[in-house]
């Protein structure tokens, strides 16, 4: 059972009565076959549900209105099987507030060269029916996606599946509640921002709860529940001697388990799926939540440190998008550099809170080590290296008049040496196109020091996300050159200023 099981995507066929009842019967038969086959064979994350043909303005408007009010409907996939005059779609598309994709396909893959006639031509008109539909989308300035390809094509399946992930993520984001335990780290700029503007743009709400409210729940956890969770720790991780039974830091592990259970109960009771903490506001907690946060991220919660609600929300959004995909997604921070004559590297980490979904197959180490900030007891944490391979880091920032999403494509590499004195999980990567260009572009564009790191998602996923939410996207990849990058920032400033 995943979040995608809570949603469905409606499959809508556009046509008209011009071609007669027999043509419409064939259209319906084709649609049923296509939808049944896609549900059975395409490995789509969501179920497709075939809706009645849209052949009149009233029928189309009714479908769009129903989609808006059906909480299970994540979006509409439209196939223009025949020509469907686009003025019929205006009223429906005007009110539609769910994601929209045109599947530009046709029932037959190959033309029947020897038998093709005008009946066949009239029945299979995606080639120009889709263009008519595309015009009205452009004329109405309506955000929509297009996937071209035969309905049996695996690449088309993957692209539709990727769009479905975006559609479900958008619906989930509309209901997302972000809990901030305490406020921002004092005097930090990029983690602040306009929470009202964010709720208007994305739909998620952000509110602050006193750490004392959390502490009450943490203190209510029973010893039996703590013991059961620590047993899970024992089977899942390699505990250091200090963290084992009779170890000098065993109580710190028990305290971490209590915090994890209390945080999870608090989040569940409040309906929160993302949260932040700050080491400057820990009154009543015995340690900075480290292990608790790592394990909650692994369960799908969004998180960021120091009150960074934008990154916490983005992490939750990206975790929903990547559910079921290979590779993990985590809170991350660019921490320090390794300069090496063109083989420059970034070491990413945080004080404690890196998600185990990005770890290698080796069991993480559970250890308790001192933490120089926060003024609390030594916190428990998981220590691991990350998987290697292509990845991205993404940052969502508030520019005052708009939100900007920055994405840098990276290559995660093996750590060339052991790090015996570094008691935190970490990732090592090469920024693309190179560290100098990537870091300068990131800084010029205002990217945060906190990011969401993902092996599961790629640049195309984040581009779709930005388009679906109508926000600015700034890309740093192997094609990035600083002069043209700076030009693009200037053009974006003019473009988005004109839309105020």
Swiss-Prot record:
Explain how, and how many, cofactor molecules are bound. Answer: Binds 1 Mn(2+) ion per subunit.
Species of origin reads Klebsiella pneumoniae (strain 342)
Q: What Gene Ontology cellular component terms go with this record?
A: cytosol
Cofactor entry = Mn(2+)
Which family does the similarity line name?
Belongs to the arabinose isomerase family.
The pathway where this protein functions is: Carbohydrate degradation; L-arabinose degradation via L-ribulose; D-xylulose 5-phosphate from L-arabinose (bacterial route): step 1/3
By its UniProt entry, which Pfam families does this protein fall under?
A: AraA_central, AraA_N, Arabinose_Iso_C
Q: What does this protein do?
A: Catalyzes the conversion of L-arabinose to L-ribulose.
Entry-linked HAMAP family: Arabinose_Isome
> Could you tell me what this protein is called?
L-arabinose isomerase
Enzyme class label:
isomerase
Cell membrane among keywords: no
E.C. code: 5.3.1.4
Which keywords, in A-to-Z order, does the entry hold? Arabinose catabolism, Carbohydrate metabolism, Isomerase, Manganese, Metal-binding
- InterPro entries linked to this entry: Ara_Isoase_C (IPR024664), AraA_central (IPR055390), AraA_N (IPR055389), AraA_N_sf (IPR038583), Fuc/Ara_isomerase_C (IPR004216), Fucose_isomerase_N/cen_sf (IPR009015), Lara_isomerase (IPR003762)
Its gene is araA
SUBUNIT field: Homohexamer.
Q: Which GO terms describe its biological process?
A: L-arabinose catabolic process to xylulose 5-phosphate
Binding of Mn(2+), residues: 306, 333, 350, 450
What is catalysed by this protein? beta-L-arabinopyranose = L-ribulose
A GO molecular function for this record? Answer: L-arabinose isomerase activity
């Amino acid at each position: 059972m995943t979040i995608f099981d809570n949603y469905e995507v409606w499959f809508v066929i556009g046509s008209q009565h011009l071609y007669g009842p027999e043509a419409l019967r064939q259209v319906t038969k084709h649609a049923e076959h296509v939808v049944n086959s896609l549900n059975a064979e395409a490995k789509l994350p969501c179920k497709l549900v075939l809706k009645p043909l849209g052949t009149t303005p009233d029928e189309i408007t009714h479908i769009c209105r129903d989609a808006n009010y059906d909480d299970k409907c994540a979006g509409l996939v439209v196939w223009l099987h025949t020509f469907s005059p686009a003025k019929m779609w205006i009223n429906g598309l005007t009110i539609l507030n769910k994601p929209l994709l045109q599947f530009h396909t046709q029932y037959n893959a190959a033309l029947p060269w020897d038998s093709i006639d005008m009946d066949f031509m009239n029945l299979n008109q995606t080639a120009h029916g889709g263009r008519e539909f595309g015009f009205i989308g452009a004329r109405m300035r309506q955000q929509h996606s297009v996937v071209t390809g035969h309905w049996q094509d695996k690449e088309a399946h993957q692209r539709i599946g990727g769009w479905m992930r975006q559609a479900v993520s958008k619906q989930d984001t509309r209901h997302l509640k972000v809990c901030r335990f305490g406020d921002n780290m004092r005097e930090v700029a990029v983690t602040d921002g306009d929470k009202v503007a964010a709720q208007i743009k994305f739909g998620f709400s952000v509110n602050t709860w006193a750490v004392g409210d959390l502490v009450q729940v943490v203190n209510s956890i029973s010893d039996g529940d703590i013991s059961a969770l620590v047993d899970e720790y024992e089977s899942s991780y390699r505990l250091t001697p200090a963290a084992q039974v009779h170890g000098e830091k065993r109580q710190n592990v028990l305290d971490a388990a209590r915090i994890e259970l209390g945080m999870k109960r608090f989040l569940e009771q409040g309906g929160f799926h993302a949260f932040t903490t700050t080491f400057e506001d820990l009154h009543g907690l015995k340690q900075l939540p480290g292990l608790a946060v790592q394990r909650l991220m692994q369960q799908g919660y969004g998180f960021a440190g120091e009150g960074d609600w934008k990154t916490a929300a983005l992490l939750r959004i990206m975790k929903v998008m990547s559910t079921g995909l290979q590779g993990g997604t985590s809170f991350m921070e660019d921490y320090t550099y390794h300069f090496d004559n063109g083989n420059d590297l970034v070491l990413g980490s945080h004080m404690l809170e890196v998600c185990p979904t990005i770890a290698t197959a080796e069991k993480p180490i559970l250890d308790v080590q001192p933490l120089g900030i926060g003024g609390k007891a030594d916190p428990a944490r998981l220590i691991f290296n990350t998987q290697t391979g292509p990845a991205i880091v993404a940052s969502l920032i508030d520019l005052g008049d708009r939100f900007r999403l920055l994405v840098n494509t990276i290559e995660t590499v093996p750590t060339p040496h052991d790090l015996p004195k570094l008691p935190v999980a970490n990732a090592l990567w090469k920024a693309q196109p190179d560290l100098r260009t990537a870091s300068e572009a990131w800084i010029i564009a205002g990217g945060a020091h906190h990011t969401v790191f993902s092996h599961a998602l790629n640049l195309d996923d984040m581009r779709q996300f930005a388009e679906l939410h109508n926000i600015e996207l700034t890309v740093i990849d192997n094609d990035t050159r600083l002069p043209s990058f700076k030009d693009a920032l200037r053009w974006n400033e003019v473009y988005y200023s004109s839309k105020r």
